[in-house]
Design a protein with these regions (language model features):
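Short, Lys/Arg-rich, polar N-terminal cytosolic tail immediately upstream
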Residues: 1-8
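Alpha-helical transmembrane segments in multi-pass membrane proteins
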Residues: 14-66, 113-125
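Aromatic-anchored segments of alpha-helical transmembrane domains
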Residues: 20-29, 92-97, 175-189, 230-245, ...
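Juxtamembrane helix-loop-helix connectors linking adjacent transmembrane helices
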Residues: 34-45, 68-226, 245-253, 257, ...
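A structural signal for well-ordered alpha-helical segments within the folded catalytic domains
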Residues: 51, 150, 265-266
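Functionally important transmembrane alpha-helices
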Residues: 203-219, 223-307
């Protein structure tokens, strides 16, 4: 299905506005006196906001344009997800190590956010209910990552078509650059309220993820630079605003988590653009949100990951 450059640019703007500016609307609503702050309704609304800020607009636009799965790069062979298991491994290891570092609970570390939710269930939120909602949140974050990053990459390729560059070169340059930036920014922040161990684990995990993705991306494939840069810029801006903005928020935190998100978004976007190996991002997205880590491209994970 052909999408004109003008339509693609409008789609990029709408999807970016939904995730960046939509966050302001959600923040305003959650501060209203009648908004539920506790209980099942509050948790379910949290799941709804995740989908509204990430997946709803891309899904509606893909349906309107008529390209559906192709709008996310997922119209290729689905068996490619098996190759993505190797990408999920370093992310899973990062999640397990950080969970052990935070809680010291060895028994339920493999249960990820589900185990954490059950352990932290309060008197007002029964463990079973909390666990179910945690599962819904995990599913929403996974779908949101696949929809938002894949959609921005595909539409960015169609919206801006300057001279094509090597896809592997973009993965190496942007991905490893993001890992290096995250390491430096995180260590600088650890001089204040941050801690150096999670910074090192996250940065090394991202670097390993980029190196593995570099082996998975087909050599000799050229794409417009904007196809990768578009989702990277959007997720970084979203992280800056989620942390409070340039002047009133925690800018060091925003830049650190934004760098990690940029590296992960680079990997997801690159694989989505290959089409034949795009489904490899599915295991990666699952691992990114089964264990809440700062590697998620979604700023909505900042609180859960304790970045």
């Amino acid at each position: 299905m052909y999408v004109s450059p003008d339509d693609a640019r409008s789609d990029v703007i709408l999807a970016a506005a939904a995730t960046v500016l939509g966050g302001f609307a959600v923040a305003f609503l959650t501060r209203l006196p009648l908004y539920p702050q506790r209980g099942l309704l509050a948790m379910l609304l949290g799941v709804v906001w995740i989908l509204a800020l990430t997946a709803v607009v891309p899904l509606l636009l893909s349906r309107y344009r008529g390209d559906r799965a192709a709008a996310f790069g997922l119209d290729g062979p689905r068996g490619a997800w098996v190759g993505g298991l190797v990408l999920a491994a370093p992310v899973a290891l990062v999640g397990i190590v950080l969970e052990l570092f935070r809680s010291g609970q060895v028994t339920d570390v493999l249960l990820g956010r589900i185990g954490t939710a059950a352990r932290l269930a309060t008197l007002f939120d029964a463990a079973a209910t909390t666990t179910v909602v945690a599962g819904l949140r995990f599913a929403a974050l996974t779908v949101g990552t696949l929809a938002l990053v894949g959609f921005l990459a595909v539409r960015g390729r169609e919206a801006f078509r300057p001279t094509d560059v090597s896809l592997t070169q973009l993965v190496r340059t942007l991905g490893m650059g993001a890992a290096g930036a995250a390491l430096v920014l995180g260590l600088l922040r650890s001089l204040g309220p941050g801690r150096p161990v999670p910074v090192l684990v996250n940065a090394v995990g991202l670097a390993v993820l980029v190196l593995l993705a570099d082996r998975l991306v087909p050599a000799g494939r050229d794409v417009p630079r904007a196809a990768i840069v578009t989702p990277v810029v959007v997720v970084v801006v979203a992280h800056v605003f989620a942390a409070g903005g340039l002047f009133r928020g925690d800018l060091p935190l925003a830049l650190y988590t934004g760098a990690l998100a940029a590296g992960t978004a680079t990997v997801i976007a690159a694989l989505a653009l290959t089409r034949d190996r795009a489904w490899a991002i599915l295991p990666l997205a699952v691992a990114l949100h089964w264990w809440p880590t700062c590697l998620s491209p979604l700023a909505l994970e900042l609180g859960a990951a304790l970045c």
